C-alpha cells in the first residue's frame, strides 16, 4: 500500500453557524480545516476529486445527510442534517463507572433490573453509533470493546478528536473526517478505495496538455513516494477497476460528442436552493455536459438507482433546468 500524503489529514472541525429551514429544521454548517500552511485544494484536479468523494461518503452515512459543501484551498465547508441528539458520551461513561464501582447482585431483583436496563442502554447505544456514523462508528466501537474500561472512554475521544459528545453533529463530522477524509487511507466496509471519478472525467475531457499535467500531478499526490510512471500506472488501474470502464472508452465517447456538435467541456452549473426566506447560502458546483452519461452510470453503481432526470441539466444552450445531484436528491430546479 503506498504511503499517502499527510496533507489530507484534517486538523479540526469547527462549527461555524446554523441556519433554519422550514421543512428541514436546523442545518449546521461546519468547517474542516487542514494542517497549517497546507493548501491541498489549490490544485484544481485535487479539488474536483473530492466532489465525488463527499457524494460517495455521505451516501452510506444514514444519520448524517449532506446538504451541501464548498471546497476552499485549505478547508471545506459542510452543511449537514443529523438525527436528533443521541446519548452523550459522558452518560455512557457514567453508567459504566457505576456498574464497575458498585457490586450488583444478579440474584437481587432490584440489581437484576438495573443490570438489564444498563445492557439495554448499551445495546441501543451501540446500534445508534453504527447507524449514525457508519464505518467510523464500527471502528470506534471496536476500540471501546478492545479496552473494556470506562476510564478510557472520554480520554480516548478527547485526545483523538478534541470532543466529548460522542454522537453530536460536530463529533460525528470530526470523526468522519479523521477516519475517512483520505480515500486511500481507509476502505469503508470492504469497498474499494474511492476513485477520483469526477477528476477522471474532468481530466480526460480537458485540453490534452492540461490533462496530462493534471493526471501526473494527481498520481504523484495520491501515490506519494512512487516514481511518476509507476504512480500513473497504479492510478489508471484503480480508476478502471472502480469505474468499470477503460480510459480509452471515455475518450471515444467524448470524441463522439464532439463529432455530434457538442462540447464535452462546456460547464453548466448545478445548484442547491433551500428557499429559506432569510437567504441561506446557495453553493454552486460545475459540471461538464460530457459527464452526465458517466454520472448516471456512477449513480446506478454506487447509489443503487440512476440519476433522476429532473435533477440533471443536459441543456446545451443553457436554457434548461438544472439542479445539484446528491444522494438525498435535495435541490430545486431553477433556470441557469
Place the predicted regions along the sequence by residue.
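Short Pro-Cys-Gly-centered "Cys-loop" motif that presents a nucleophilic cysteine in a tight turn
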Residues: 1-73, 81-336
Amino acid at each position: 500500500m503506498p504511503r499517502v500524503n499527510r496533507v489530507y489529514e484534517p486538523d479540526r472541525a469547527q462549527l461555524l453557524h446554523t441556519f433554519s429551514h422550514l421543512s428541514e429544521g436546523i442545518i449546521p454548517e461546519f468547517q474542516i480545516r487542514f494542517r497549517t500552511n497546507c493548501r491541498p485544494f489549490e490544485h484544481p484536479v485535487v479539488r474536483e476529486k473530492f466532489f465525488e468523494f463527499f457524494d460517495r461518503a455521505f451516501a452510506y452515512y444514514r444519520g448524517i445527510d449532506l446538504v451541501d459543501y464548498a471546497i476552499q484551498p485549505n478547508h471545506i465547508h459542510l452543511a449537514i442534517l443529523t438525527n436528533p441528539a443521541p446519548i452523550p458520551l459522558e452518560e455512557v461513561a457514567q453508567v459504566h463507572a457505576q456498574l464497575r464501582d458498585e457490586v450488583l447482585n444478579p440474584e437481587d431483583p432490584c440489581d437484576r433490573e438495573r443490570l438489564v436496563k444498563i445492557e439495554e442502554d448499551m445495546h441501543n447505544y451501540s446500534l445508534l453509533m453504527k447507524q449514525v456514523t457508519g464505518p467510523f462508528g464500527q471502528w470506534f466501537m471496536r476500540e471501546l470493546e478492545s479496552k473494556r474500561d470506562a476510564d478510557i472512554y472520554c480520554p480516548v475521544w478527547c485526545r483523538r478528536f478534541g470532543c466529548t459528545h460522542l454522537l453530536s453533529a460536530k463529533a460525528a463530522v470530526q470523526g468522519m473526517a479523521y477516519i475517512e477524509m483520505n480515500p486511500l487511507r481507509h476502505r469503508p466496509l470492504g469497498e474499494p478505495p474511492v476513485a477520483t471519478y469526477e477528476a477522471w472525467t474532468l481530466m480526460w475531457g480537458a485540453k490534452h496538455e492540461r490533462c496530462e499535467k493534471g493526471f501526473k500531478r494527481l498520481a504523484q499526490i495520491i501515490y506519494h513516494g512512487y516514481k511518476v510512471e509507476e504512480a500513473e500506472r497504479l492510478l489508471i488501474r484503480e480508476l478502471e477497476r472502480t469505474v468499470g470502464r477503460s480510459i480509452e472508452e471515455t475518450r471515444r465517447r467524448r470524441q463522439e460528442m464532439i463529432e455530434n456538435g457538442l462540447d464535452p467541456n462546456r460547464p453548466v452549473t448545478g445548484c442547491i436552493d433551500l428557499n429559506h426566506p432569510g437567504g441561506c447560502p446557495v453553493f454552486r458546483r460545475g459540471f461538464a455536459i460530457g459527464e452526465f452519461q458517466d454520472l448516471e452510470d456512477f449513480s446506478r453503481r454506487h447509489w443503487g438507482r440512476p440519476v433522476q432526470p429532473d435533477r440533471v441539466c443536459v441543456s446545451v444552450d443553457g436554457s434548461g433546468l438544472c439542479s445539484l445531484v446528491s444522494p438525498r436528491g435535495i435541490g430545486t430546479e431553477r433556470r441557469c
